[in-house]
């Protein structure tokens, strides 16, 4: 996709020079934050001028959300020991202990998930809990503001004004339910700018759910708001958008500020490199007897469409070599997670998927499982585990249901009524606990009380019980500590090498993909952007994730 | 707009309802209000009998099974009868709560309708002031007669089962007090036991199960010569069964009638020729009791009270409307009652309201295995 | 070890400790006032046996994720019809009892299936809809009892000669067959091996069922529907099976109940049948998401013992009968407690 | 919901131009029951004057109770079965007024005054309980009603006369403890109805009582247009969003319960003054059941209910109640079958209405998903 820079951008750039001299509206200095001993932010600083659009970019887990949580005084920050460093607004040090205080200080936030009531009109949503009221006889009698009438004309006037500032011609009294997603985003923004005191607006990945035209309109509004003197902090993955609107760009990586660029110094390639770049400690992976090749294809995906909210797959085709570890990368929202979920029948899917030439019927987990596919879900606690059940039940249940494992052999004719073979299951679970080094009190322990890493191992054990030919693993290291991460990755490599399992591993952490995979496929907007070798340069990965190179890079 | 359309439909419906309706009539009608058979077969069948006898002259409607909660429906059923201009008299048996309210409402538009009640549940004095005529078994007298009968059957103790809701009914509470006095006078130990309320949330089964469990306990404690009595209809079957099994004495049901409790408790076979044939039913009960070894320990009235009350009320209503009698004429009332019962009856007025038409009735008893059938 | 101890305490829970304490007070009082404690215990055991299977009927619906089965009267009605057909056909004794079950179960399967189809279409409102479906089906069956073509002269009304009586005596048919089977005495406590054994047999059957492939699939579907889906389990079907199982158990439960009780109760009697069963399983420590056989046994024992002993004992001690009202408050208080406690359920 | 001229224009332009299919789809429940009522009225063959009289009396008697359900629905708490608590408060007040012998309208007003704080306190407690059972409000409020019934019995059967002083022998049981099962409310009987009750072509209209109900509609409309009303609606739509937006969700829900309970208490007093006698231990038991049935028949759902639906619901439900026993009797030829038929209809109504709504919700959600997929 080629990017056409709008003409007025030049003007904004011109302005930015002047702004250097203007007073900063926000400064966050030397912010350091630890969660349970893990440093997630290390001496991060960022500042904002009135009328500036400041882009904050970084991979998942780079620390953007934590920084914003600090700015908003979220309870989660204070309940976990606070942070060090200081926040200044208009040059004065502030201590924001709650979102309400942040709001009072003039900070507005456009939420990623819409905080809109579908049954209310646009006006009612914009003025939610800030409704202007007029007195009436009863409210005077009881001296209660609660009994004041809503001042509907003023509400509408205010809402109209806010919508006009965004150049939104929609009827302010239309109900929100049924509006296109893009409009909802604008209503969120309108609500923020309707707050008279708002001078700083934070946009947290606002375009993630928008179509291209909607995204363009949103960027347009951003510029408009900046022109009105509002300082904007713009968090996004989409580098082309950054290039289109940002005056300055701050790149976060692993909780540290790696770069701060002015618009004129920045090029997409450079930002991408800064975002993903990290010293990849290339470990020598054990060799195989026979290296996988295109001659021997295990799984063919053809024009796969998956309707997974937030991770739509829109016609993806891909071939997986037998015996390889294939990585699937890409930015959040581009559909990399939808692939495995679609093939495994968890979300509505269409297209053609075949294993060894045999067609796999879609939309049925049972069909996929019984054909030697297995899946370790990214949603460990939601999809992957029965939290209140013991380890052995978690490990065995899928294999039991799909392959009649761990069951007594009687009655032959009615497998549904065969009893569970406790001894066999227990023995298997104990074996797995030993092999995967699951730290627990025994196979009877409910998995809820296990640590994240051990829970993940239970998930993998569950998939292994199926003895799969092809294993899908999504976000295998999400939310587990560093030591456990390595163990999990090692485990996957061992499975691949020792048991010849073909692994398709989806991850938001490019680093780990590059560490263990034979090839890394990058997904962009629901389609395959290209496949790179793990040792391709940071810039190549960055560009491909930003959708800046065509297909067939390999 | 949408509201308008619905509103229009409602109006259209009410208008159409007016068009649909239209009734032709005989000279006058009598309304009868009873419960369903599951509440008590006697009064329902009494109404059926009257319906069979007088045909269209009788309008029979039902109050709800859970009449305690659905007063409004009872009221609507009664006022519904009164809405028919041909209805000149309404018989309510049993007169469950809500009847007084209904009568008051009807009086405002139809002061001409006479109300005849059987077994009123509400305050007797209140009922006496409202209804034109009421029948109730003479609870105070029965307080004496039942205990005397028990003594006659060999009782040394007298066990009285009830529960808060019934003891909140003044007549029943008073009767219990009288029973106690009479028992003490006769040298019988009076025992008051609490049972679960069958109208409570565990319902009739819970109450019945309690009786089945409690009677053996009591008999073990007090011996076989104990007379059992309960204020609640649904407890009669388990009481009779337990009395038969333990050898206790059962002098009378709450609502005295051969068909109340006995047929179900004894698993009586009702052949075609027995249907509605009281003497035949009495004989069959007698045979069953004797066979099970209960001779001389079980008794009841020879007539199904509620059954005959419906008949008596209808006849009294007819004769009153046709000017053949006065409701305040105790002898005339008694004559019609005895005609319906075909056994002698004793009748008196409620002592608290000597000038009202609240009549209290008593009948002699028949003892199974002793009397001739 | 401390974990185990903590778990045990958690398992017992405050409400159960309270009720157990209350029961202890009652038994001590009974002893002091000279009541026969073994007799009270015997009565309580009978109650446990007769109510147990109805309580057990709650387990499948809770396990498959539908929640408490407020539609229990549906199964009860099936059981009553089965019991009636057996009587109409003149079966006596154990054959009568088993014939009743044999007639009732297929009916319950059909009714349970239809009920599950209905509940599937009202997801999220299962308990409310269940309550009212139960209520209205009782009324429909009232009409059925009046019109049904039963001819057995022992079943019909005395004066009218048609329609079924509201209370049918089972004495000549299969009344007390279980209760009188294998009766023995320990320490003066009369125990009916037949009745208690039958209840425990069903506990065992249900326990084993939840150890089969199907049962585990159902548990999984109830515990985490998304997990179940990802494990290739048809969640809808599991709910169906759970509701059918519950309905069948209710049908068998009412037959056991009736034979012990000695009567079949028709008309409005089944209306409130669900409530004591629900109270019992909640008192036993079950939540809206999870119920075990142990919950059933503990709950039934505590609740039924409370019902059986509280009234006769307290009415000895205090004049009047506050115990009847106290029972109302305690049992509803327990359900309320459970509803306000269990978290996470949506 | 507040409507602006534009909104109406949009509606009339789009889908209300007598599009019968749309009307049937969105009002399936009331139309079903309207059809049922007409059929049954035709079968029952009641006199129109009687039917009108009966329906108007019942409308006057019950509409306030049904209206009391609206606010909790608006606040997203579903159908409030615990209005029986309000009814109990009202009965306590009615008993007190009878005891003190305050007659006529002043007696009625005294009872209202007395019932209000009682209902407010109990309603607040109910709100606290329901806040701990979010998502299960309906079944919880139902059990709460049963529970409160136990407390009520404890007070009036055992404490009155023993712990609570009570000096009227005629209202107490013979043994001096506990209130009798029927209390004659002669002092306040029909006090409101009697003020002005003209007869128009055979139909007696208790004008003042009807006006009270309509007045309550105005009050509710007023409330919903105030700041607190807006909060209630916001909480009703999505508790989490409301919380994030700084609305005190728990407090708002408690206010909803207090309002509902207080209105229910007044409603029960209107009901009792019309009936004229009080069934001490049972009058309140079915209040929640029947009011809810009426509201559902009017087309309300557990998530959305309007004043109009409440009023239409009262009329339809009670028409059905008046005609169904007779219709059943005529249809089956046996009076008691008619009665069971009526019970079936009463309970069945709620089951069917809940089922239809749940089904409609699912259909709507499915459509929303389909649309979302299409726009992609």
Segments (PLM) and residue ranges:
Chain B
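Extracytoplasmic "Venus flytrap"
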Residues: 27-50, 54, 61-75, 91-97
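Periplasmic-binding protein-like
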Residues: 31-34, 85-96, 113-118, 159-160, ...
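An alpha-beta-alpha
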Residues: 47, 139-192, 317, 338
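Short, well-structured alpha-helical segments in soluble
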Residues: 71-88, 105, 205-224
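Flexible loop/hinge segments that line or gate small-molecule binding clefts
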Residues: 106-137
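Hydrophobic alpha-helical segments within soluble ligand-binding/sensing domains
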Residues: 134-160, 210-213, 280-289, 304-321
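Extracellular/periplasmic periplasmic-binding protein-like sensory domains
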Residues: 184-190, 237-322
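Hinge/cleft segment of the Venus flytrap/periplasmic-binding protein
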Residues: 281-373
């Amino acid at each position: 996709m080629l990017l056409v820079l709008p003409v007025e951008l030049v003007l904004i750039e011109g302005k930015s020079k002047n702004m250097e001299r203007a007073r900063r509206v926000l400064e966050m200095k030397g912010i350091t934050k630890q969660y349970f001993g893990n440093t997630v932010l290390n001496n991060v600083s960022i500042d904002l001028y009135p009328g500036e659009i400041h882009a904050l970019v970084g991979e998942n887990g780079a620390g953007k959300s934590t920084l914003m949580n600090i700015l908003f005084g979220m309870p989660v920050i204070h309940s976990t020991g606070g942070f060090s460093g200081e926040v200044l607004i208009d040059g004065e040090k502030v201590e924001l202990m709650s979102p309400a205080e942040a709001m009072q200080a003039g900070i507005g936030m456009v939420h990623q998930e819409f905080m809109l009531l579908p049954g209310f009109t646009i006006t009612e949503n914009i003025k939610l809990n800030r409704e202007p009221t007029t007195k009436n006889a009863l409210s005077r009698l009881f001296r209660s503001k609660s009994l004041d009438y809503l001042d509907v004309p003023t509400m509408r006037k205010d809402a109209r004004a806010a919508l006009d500032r965004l150049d939104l011609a929609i009827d302010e009294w239309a109900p929100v339910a049924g509006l296109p997603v893009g409009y909802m985003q604008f209503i969120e923004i309108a609500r923020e700018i309707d707050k008279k005191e708002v001078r700083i607006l934070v946009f947290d990945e606002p375009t993630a759910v928008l179509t291209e035209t909607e995204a363009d309109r949103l960027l347009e509004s951003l510029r408009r708001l900046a022109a009105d003197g509002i300082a904007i902090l713009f968090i996004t993955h989409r580098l082309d958008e950054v290039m289109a609107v940002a005056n300055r760009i701050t790149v976060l990586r692993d909780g540290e500020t790696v770069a701060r660029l002015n618009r004129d110094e920045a090029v997409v390639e450079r930002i991408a490199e800064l975002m993903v770049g990290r010293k990849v400690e290339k470990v020598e992976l054990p060799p195989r007897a026979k290296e996988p090749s295109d001659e021997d294809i295990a799984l063919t995906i053809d024009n796969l469409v998956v309707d997974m909210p937030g991770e739509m797959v829109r016609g993806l085709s891909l071939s997986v070599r037998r015996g390889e570890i294939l990585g699937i990368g890409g930015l959040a929202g581009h559909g990399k997670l939808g692939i495995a979920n679609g093939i495994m029948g968890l979300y509505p899917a269409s297209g053609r998927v075949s294993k060894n030439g045999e067609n796999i019927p879609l939309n049925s987990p049972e069909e996929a499982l019984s054909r030697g596919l297995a899946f370790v879900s990214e949603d460990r606690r939601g999809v992957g585990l029965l939290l209140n059940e013991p380890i052995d039940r978690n490990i065995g249940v899928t294999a039991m249901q799909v392959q009649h494992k761990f069951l007594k052999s009687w009655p032959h004719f009615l497998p549904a009524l065969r009893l569970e073979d406790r001894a066999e299951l227990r023995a298997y679970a104990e074996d797995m606990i030993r092999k995967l080094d699951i730290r627990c009190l025994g196979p009877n322990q409910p998995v809820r009380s296990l640590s994240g890493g051990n829970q993940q191992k239970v998930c993998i054990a569950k998939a292994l019980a199926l003895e799969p030919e092809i294993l899908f693993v999504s976000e295998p290291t999400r939310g587990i500590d560093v030591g456990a991460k390595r163990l999990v990755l090692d485990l996957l490599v061992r499975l691949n090498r020792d048991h010849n399992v073909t692994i398709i591993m989806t991850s938001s952490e490019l680093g780990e993909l590059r560490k263990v995979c034979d090839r890394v496929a990058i997904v962009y907007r629901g389609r395959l952007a290209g496949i790179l070798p793990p040792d391709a340069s940071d810039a190549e990965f960055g560009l491909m994730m930003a959708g800046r190179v065509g297909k067939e890079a390999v | 707009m949408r509201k308008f359309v619905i509103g229009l439909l409602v109006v259209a419906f009410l208008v159409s309802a007016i068009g649909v309706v239209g009734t032709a009539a005989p000279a006058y009608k009598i309304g009868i209000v009873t419960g369903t058979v599951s509440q008590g077969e006697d009064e329902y069948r009494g109404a059926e009998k009257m319906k069979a006898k007088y045909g269209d002259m009788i309008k029979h409607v039902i109050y709800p099974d859970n009449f305690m909660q659905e007063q409004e429906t009872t009221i609507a059923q009664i006022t519904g009868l009164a809405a028919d201009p041909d209805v000149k008299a309404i018989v309510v048996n049993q007169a469950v709560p809500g009847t007084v309210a209904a009568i008051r409402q009807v009086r405002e538009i139809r002061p001409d309708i006479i109300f005849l009640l059987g077994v009123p549940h509400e305050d007797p004095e209140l009922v006496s002031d409202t209804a034109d005529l009421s029948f109730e078994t003479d609870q105070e007298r029965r307080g004496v007669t039942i205990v005397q009968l028990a003594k006659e059957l060999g009782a040394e103790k007298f066990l009285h089962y009830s529960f808060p809701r019934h003891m909140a009914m003044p007549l029943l509470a008073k009767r219990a007090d009288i029973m106690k006095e009479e028992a003490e006078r006769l040298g019988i130990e009076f025992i008051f036991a609490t049972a679960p309320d069958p109208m409570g949330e565990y319902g009739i089964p819970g109450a019945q199960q309690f009786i089945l469990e409690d009677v053996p306990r009591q008999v073990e404690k007090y011996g076989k010569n104990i007379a059992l009595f309960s204020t609640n209809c649904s407890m009669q079957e388990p009481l009779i069964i337990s009395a038969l099994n333990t050898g206790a004495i059962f002098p009378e049901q709450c609502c005295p009638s051969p068909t109340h409790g006995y047929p179900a408790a004894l698993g009586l076979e009702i052949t075609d020729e027995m249907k509605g044939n009281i003497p035949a039913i009495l004989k069959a009960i007698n045979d069953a009791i004797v066979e099970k070894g209960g001779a001389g320990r079980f008794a009841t009235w020879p007539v199904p009270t509620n059954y005959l009350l419906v008949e008596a009320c209808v006849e009294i209503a007819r004769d009153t409307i046709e000017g053949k009698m006065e409701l305040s004429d105790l002898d005339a009332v008694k004559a019609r009652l005895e005609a319906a019962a075909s056994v002698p009856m004793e009748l008196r007025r409620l002592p608290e309201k000597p000038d009202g038409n609240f009549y209290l009735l008593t009948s002699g008893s028949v003892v199974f295995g002793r009397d001739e059938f | 070890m401390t974990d185990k101890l903590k778990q045990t305490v958690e398992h017992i829970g405050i409400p159960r400790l309270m009720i157990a304490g209350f029961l202890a007070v009652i038994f001590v009082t009974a002893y002091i006032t000279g009541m026969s404690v073994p007799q009270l215990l015997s009565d309580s055991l009978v109650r446990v046996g007769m109510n147990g299977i109805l309580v057990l009927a709650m387990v499948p619906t809770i396990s498959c994720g539908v929640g408490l089965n407020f539609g229990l009267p549906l199964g009860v009605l099936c059981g009553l019809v089965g019991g009636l057909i057996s009587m109409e056909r003149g079966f006596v004794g154990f054959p009568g009892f088993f014939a009743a079950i044999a007639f009732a179960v297929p009916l319950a399967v059909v009714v349970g299936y239809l009920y599950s189809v209905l509940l599937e279409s009202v997801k999220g409102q299962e308990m409310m809809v269940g309550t009212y479906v139960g209520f209205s089906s009782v009324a429909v069956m009232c009409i059925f009892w009046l019109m049904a073509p039963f001819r057995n002269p022992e079943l019909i009304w005395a004066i009218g000669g048609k329609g079924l009586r509201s209370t049918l005596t089972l004495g000549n048919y299969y009344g007390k067959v279980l209760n009188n089977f294998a009766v023995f005495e320990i320490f003066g406590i009369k125990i009916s091996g037949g009745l208690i054994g039958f209840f425990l047999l069903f506990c065992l059957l249900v326990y084993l069922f939840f150890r089969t492939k199907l049962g585990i699939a159902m548990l999984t579907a109830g515990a985490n529907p998304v997990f179940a889906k990802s494990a290739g389990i048809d969640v809808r079907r599991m709910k169906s099976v759970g509701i059918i199982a519950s309905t069948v158990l209710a049908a068998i439960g009412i037959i056991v109940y009736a034979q012990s009780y000695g009567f079949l109760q028709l008309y409005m009697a089944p209306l409130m049948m669900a409530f004591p069963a629900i109270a019992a399983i909640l008192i036993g420590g079950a939540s809206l998401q999870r119920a075990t056989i142990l919950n059933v046994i503990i709950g039934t024992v505590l609740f039924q013992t409370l019902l059986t002993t509280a009234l006769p004992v307290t009415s000895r001690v205090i004049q009047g009968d506050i115990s009847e009202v106290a029972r109302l408050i305690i049992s509803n208080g327990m359900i309320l407690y459970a509803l306000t406690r269990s978290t996470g359920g949506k | 919901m507040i409507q602006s001229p534009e909104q109406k224009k949009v509606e009339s332009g789009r889908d209300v131009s007598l599009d019968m299919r749309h009307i049937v789809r969105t009002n399936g429940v009331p139309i079903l029951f309207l059809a049922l009522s007409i059929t049954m009225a035709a079968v029952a063959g009641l006199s129109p004057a009687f039917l009108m009289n009966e329906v108007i009396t019942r409308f006057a008697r019950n509409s306030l109770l049904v209206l009391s359900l609206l606010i909790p629905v608006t606040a997203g708490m579903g159908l409030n079965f615990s209005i029986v608590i309000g009814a109990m408060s009202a009965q306590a007040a009615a008993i007190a007024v009878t005891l003190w012998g305050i007659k006529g309208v002043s007696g009625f007003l005294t009872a209202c005054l007395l019932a209000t704080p009682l209902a407010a306190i109990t309603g607040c407690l109910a709100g606290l309980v329901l806040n701990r059972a979010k998502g299960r409000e309906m079944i919880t409020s139902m059990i709460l009603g049963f529970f409160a019934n136990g407390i009520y019995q404890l007070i009036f059967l055992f404490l009155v006369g023993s712990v609570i002083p009570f000096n009227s022998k005629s209202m107490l049981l013979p043994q001096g403890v506990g209130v009798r099962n029927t209390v004659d409310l002669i002092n306040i009987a029909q006090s409101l109805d009697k003020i002005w009750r003209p007869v128009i072509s055979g139909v007696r209209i208790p004008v003042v009582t009807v006006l009270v109900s309509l007045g309550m509609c105005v009050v509710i409309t007023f409330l919903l247009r105030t700041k607190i009303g807006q909060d209630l609606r916001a909480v009703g739509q999505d508790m989490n969003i409301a919380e994030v937006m700084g609305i005190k969700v728990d407090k708002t829900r408690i206010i909803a319960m207090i309002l509902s309970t207080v209105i229910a208490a007044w409603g029960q007093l209107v009901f009792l003054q019309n009936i004229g006698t009080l069934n001490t231990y049972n009058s309140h038991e079915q209040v929640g059941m029947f009011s809810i049935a009426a509201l559902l028949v009017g087309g309300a759902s557990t998530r959305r209910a309007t004043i109009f639906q409440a009023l239409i619901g009262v009329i339809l439900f009670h028409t059905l109640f008046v005609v169904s026993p007779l219709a059943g009797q005529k249809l089956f030829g046996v009076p008691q079958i008619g009665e069971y038929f009526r019970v079936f209809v009463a309970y069945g109504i709620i089951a069917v209405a809940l089922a239809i709504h749940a089904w409609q919700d699912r259909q709507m959600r499915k459509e929303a998903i389909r649309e979302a997929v299409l726009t992609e």
